[in-house]
Amino acid sequence: XWSCTKGCPDAKQCEAT
């Protein structure tokens, strides 16, 4: 998954961790 701190392309697919 994507990491929110890395700046994912879609916040909805971004992991809360």
Curated annotation (Swiss-Prot):
GO terms for cellular component: extracellular region. Keywords: Calcium, Hemagglutinin, Immunity, Innate immunity, Lectin, Mannose-binding, Secreted. GO terms for molecular function: D-mannose binding. It is found in: Secreted. Its main location: secreted. One of its GO terms (biological process) is innate immune response. The keyword Secreted applies. It comes from the Eukaryota. Calcium-dependent lectin involved in innate immune defense. Binds mannose residues on the surface of the Gram-negative bacterium A.salmonicida. Shows agglutinating activity towards horse erythrocytes. Forms an oligomeric complex with the C-type lectin 65 kDa subunit. This is C-type lectin 35 kDa subunit. It comes from Petromyzon marinus.
